[in-house]
C-alpha cells in the first residue's frame, strides 16, 4: 500500500526538545510516542499541544512566532529571574536554525 506523502509533507518536522517558536532549548515538546507534552515554553509562553503540535504547518508555526516577535516584542514569558544571562532572543532563534522574522 502506497501512502500519500503530500499531506504529511505539509507538516513541520518537529524535534522532541526545543521550542519551534522561539528556539528555547530547555523544553520537551514531544514525548517518546511523538505526542505533545503540553509543556509551556519558559521563554515565549507557547504551549506544546495548544499553540502548535506535531501536525502544525510551517505557516501556523510562523504565525505564532510572528505574534511573539512583533506583538509581544520577544518578551520573556516566564519568571524574570530565570532569564539566561546575556539572553538575546534573535541569537537564540538563529542558533536553533529558525529564520528570524522581521521585527516591524
List each model region and its residues.
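Short, non-ligating residues that shape and space the ligands of small metal-coordination modules
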Residues: 28-29, 50-51
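Short linker/helix segments within small regulatory modules
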Residues: 30-39
Amino acid at each position: 500500500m502506497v501512502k500519500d506523502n503530500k499531506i504529511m509533507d505539509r507538516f513541520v518536522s518537529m524535534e522532541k526538545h526545543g521550542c519551534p517558536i522561539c528556539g528555547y532549548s530547555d523544553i520537551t515538546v514531544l514525548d517518546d510516542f511523538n505526542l505533545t507534552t503540553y509543556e509551556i515554553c519558559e521563554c515565549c509562553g507557547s504551549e506544546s499541544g495548544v499553540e502548535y503540535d506535531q501536525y502544525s504547518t510551517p505557516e501556523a508555526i510562523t504565525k505564532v512566532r510572528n505574534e511573539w516577535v512583533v506583538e509581544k516584542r520577544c518578551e520573556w514569558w516566564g519568571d524574570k529571574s530565570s532569564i539566561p544571562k546575556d539572553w538575546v532572543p534573535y541569537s537564540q532563534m538563529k542558533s536553533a536554525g529558525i529564520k528570524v522574522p522581521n521585527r516591524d
